[in-house]
């Protein structure tokens, strides 16, 4: 049994095949960095146009690879269903019409996928085992959340950002520092040359016992420091280091509170920012000290990808969560706690 997965929620176009016996047998992704880099951020209209061209290329490529063209008997035998992201994400990027057309042409059902749930399950894809129930830190360009996952489809948001997501703040500060897009990794690379303690930035909302985050004030504060500092490489490195430490410390403090509140064995970390080296080091220390088990997504699954979509589609197909209805709806503001199985 094979599931075709498609991911287009933001600026990565990705297609994958998950097989019941063999696992992830194919995974192809095209980014749009060259399209958006000169704007230092994602331009929704350009992202939408790029998806149409890139998805067509990837589908042709993956079908040709498995000799699916001009085959009279593959319709029912090769793919059992098409799983694709319906939200959250950029409205123009979620190309459900193309995905539904593929399902209709193959006469197979489709599976609606919550992009955030895909990120959570990317950790289970990485380790190839069931980790429910678990606590999770989801940190990406658009999301910063602490989540209690009871079982497949049942997720409780314990805390989330009240304004900016961690990844967004990383990219914003990277832009102010004059670094290229995408900025998060470039900022972390620059921070390696910084001297710790040259600056001290606030750890927002860490004096509160709730699990929510807020980074807009920190973002503005660091921006003002940059604009009033010298343009030297060392000065930029020092600011980058202190900023990264402030972000990571804030996440760690909130994770510590979550661990005390929810008594489960497994702690999962996912999303693009989960590949951050400093975050991984400090989380390992925290989880080891509290005698829990820590699981990260493989780095190739940290950013947006269809591997996690196909895998989640496989799990949902096994539970009968698929449809033949002619729905073309998208859900740009979908929450991890929303149930879309039968929409």
From Swiss-Prot:
Localization annotation: Cytoplasm
Pfam family, one: TsaD
Keywords: Acyltransferase, Cytoplasm, Iron, Metal-binding, Transferase, tRNA processing
Reaction equation(s) it catalyzes: L-threonylcarbamoyladenylate + adenosine(37) in tRNA = N(6)-L-threonylcarbamoyladenosine(37) in tRNA + AMP + H(+)
Principal subcellular localisation of the protein: cytoplasm
Domain of life of the source: Bacteria
Binding positions (substrate): 138-142, 171, 184, 276
Coiled coil: none
PANTHER family according to UniProt: TRNA N6-ADENOSINE THREONYLCARBAMOYLTRANSFERASE (PTHR11735), TRNA N6-ADENOSINE THREONYLCARBAMOYLTRANSFERASE, MITOCHONDRIAL (PTHR11735:SF6)
HAMAP family (UniProt xref): TsaD
Protein name stated in the entry: tRNA N6-adenosine threonylcarbamoyltransferase
Source species of the chain: Buchnera aphidicola subsp. Cinara cedri (strain Cc)
């Amino acid at each position: 049994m094979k599931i075709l997965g498609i991911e287009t929620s933001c600026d990565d176009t990705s297609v994958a095949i998950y097989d019941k016996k063999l696992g992830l047998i194919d995974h192809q992704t095209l980014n749009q960095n060259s399209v958006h880099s000169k704007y230092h951020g994602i331009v929704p209209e350009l992202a939408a146009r790029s998806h149409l061209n890139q998805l067509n290329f990837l589908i042709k490529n993956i079908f040709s690879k498995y000799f699916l063209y001009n085959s009279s008997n593959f319709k029912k035998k090769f793919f059992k269903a098409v799983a694709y992201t319906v939200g959250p994400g950029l409205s123009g990027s979620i190309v459900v019409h193309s995905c539904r057309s593929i399902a209709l042409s193959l006469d197979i059902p489709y599976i609606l996928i919550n992009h955030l749930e895909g990120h959570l399950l990317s950790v289970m894809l990485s380790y190839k085992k069931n980790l429910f129930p678990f606590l999770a830190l989801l940190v990406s360009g658009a999301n910063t959340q602490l989540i209690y996952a009871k079982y497949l489809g049942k997720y409780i948001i314990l805390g989330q950002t009240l304004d900016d997501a961690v990844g967004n703040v990383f990219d914003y500060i990277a832009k102010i520092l004059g670094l290229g897009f995408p900025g998060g990794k470039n900022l972390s690379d620059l921070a390696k040359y910084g001297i710790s303690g040259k600056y001290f930035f606030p750890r927002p909302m860490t004096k509160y016992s709730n699990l929510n985050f807020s980074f807009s004030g920190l973002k503005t504060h660091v921006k003002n420091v940059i604009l009033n500092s010298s343009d030297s490489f060392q000065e930029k490195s020092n600011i980058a280091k202190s900023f990264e430490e402030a972000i990571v410390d804030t996440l760690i403090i909130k994770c510590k509170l979550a661990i005390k509140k929810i008594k489960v064995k497994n702690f999962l970390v996912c999303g693009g920012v989960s590949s951050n080296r400093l975050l991984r080091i400090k989380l390992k220390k925290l989880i080891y000290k509290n005698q829990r088990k820590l699981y990260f997504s493989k780095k190739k699954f940290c950013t947006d990808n269809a591997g996690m979509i196909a895998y989640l589609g496989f799990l949902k197909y096994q539970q009968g969560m698929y449809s033949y209805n002619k729905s073309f709806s998208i859900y740009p503001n979908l929450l991890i706690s929303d149930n879309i199985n039968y929409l």
